[in-house]
């Protein structure tokens, strides 16, 4: 598989606190890569650096061989990078349809696209996530699960090559979580996207991820298949705990 994203020795500090320390890894086209670690491990900082919301102190990020380290978030979106947020960030005064259409205008194939065309395209993404019947409802009036799905529709509408998913299972009941897992799997297959998935629900990554990267204190603890990572002693000690049932 071709290399899609390459992270080279990135470091990020906040005052005297080292949030990310000389971290390197790669993501290849077509993969689902899980990203785990205890609270405060630096996961959110890594995602914010990779998506352009924070600047790394040192190191380099490449996408498709292009150095994107200094690019703004909108420039990275044009390169094909999209993300969801752990806490949904809707446009509260826009309808679900207008919210997705607005995001569609930010993607990598949107030069000179009209808002009317974006609205038409947005209907397809709302149908995909099961929100077509809610298209005329303001985002502020959607349920929490519906906001999660709206967030996914908005990210897909940018036609990403690489999608960062940030703890999409948080706050969902078992039925909603199952629907979300199946929907993400369908999105990967139907739209040909690569996924970098930050998640605390390990059972989800055991089912969905091709590889998992574990970090703690901003440094890589382990990297490998889900089975290899959950059986790694450093990961068990720092994150999973001794009560975790290892996979043979």
PLM region spans:
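Glycine-rich phosphate-binding loops of nucleotide-dependent enzymes
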Residues: 2-248
């Amino acid at each position: 598989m071709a290399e899609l994203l390459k992270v080279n020795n990135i470091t990020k500090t906040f005052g005297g606190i080292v949030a990310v320390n000389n971290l390197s890894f790669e993501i290849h086209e077509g993969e689902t890569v899980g990203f785990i670690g205890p609270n405060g491990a630096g996961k959110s900082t890594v995602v914010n650096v990779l998506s352009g919301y924070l600047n790394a102190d040192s190191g380099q990020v490449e996408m498709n061989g292009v150095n994107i380290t200094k690019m703004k978030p909108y420039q990275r979106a044009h390169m094909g990078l999209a993300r969801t947020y752990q806490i949904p960030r809707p446009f509260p005064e826009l309808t679900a349809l207008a919210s997705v259409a607005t995001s569609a205008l930010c993607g990598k194939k949107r030069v000179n696209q009209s808002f009317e065309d974006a609205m038409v395209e947005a209907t397809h993404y709302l149908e995909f996530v099961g929100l077509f019947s809610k298209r005329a409802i303001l985002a502020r009036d959607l349920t929490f699960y519906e906001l999660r799905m709206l967030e996914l529709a908005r990210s897909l509408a940018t036609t990403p090559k690489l999608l960062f998913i940030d703890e999409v299972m948080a706050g969902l009941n078992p039925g909603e979580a199952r629907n979300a897992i199946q929907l993400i799997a369908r999105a990967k297959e139907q739209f040909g996207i690569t996924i970098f998935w930050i998640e605390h629900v390990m059972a989800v990554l055991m089912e969905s991820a091709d590889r998992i990267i574990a970090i703690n204190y901003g440094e890589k603890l382990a990297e490998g298949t889900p089975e290899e990572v959950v059986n790694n002693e450093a990961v068990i000690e720092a994150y999973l705990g001794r009560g975790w049932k290892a996979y043979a």
